[in-house]
Amino acid sequence: EAGYATPLPVQLGGQPHVIVSSGRAYSAVKVADGQEAWNLRWFTRYGVNAADAIVDGDQVFVGSGYRKGCGLYKIGAELTEVWKNKNLSTQMNAAVKIGDHLYGFDGDSGGPGKLRCVSWKTGEVVWEHATGFGALTAADDRLIVLTGTGALMTAPATPKGFKPSGRTRVLDKDCWTAPVLANGLLYCRNSKGHLVCLDLRRGQ
């Protein structure tokens, strides 16, 4: 059964694996022989497990939309739940982990989404900002945020709050794809397939 998330290459126990999603689960598969190392049953409405898992050391975070929520698990012979709640329902795009915090969008497209900072260790909400639904990436400890209506913002990634340095409309709605930064160029796309490229290189 196919899923929406991109297969994520990771090292688990010193061996290469990929974490893949289906409409019913997230699982880790050994690259060498295709054997499943672990399987986390994760049922989301419409079978939409679209956000990539996040692995840090011996822990894995997963989340999905439609009010399914999120959870952090310790990786071992079996997965052990660390915490699970509905504080970060990442519908289409993964959150990003910087330091001891997750930054991502809670909520579904077309609804009152919020940008949230959530503690990696406890799952508690540290702050939230009423941006509406959107997508984000990060570079140099800064968040690059694209709202669902096409507004682009950047801000320091800090648990002290969301303080964007500016806001610029770069596209029409609906923007569901995370911005991509490569070689000083920032690419943003909307659901109609319109693509913009912004040159962020200084003095060039």
Where are these regions (language model features)?
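C-terminal hydrophobic structural anchor segments
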Residues: 126-164
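Short loop/turn segments immediately following the C-termini of beta-strands
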Residues: 21-23, 65, 107-109, 148, ...
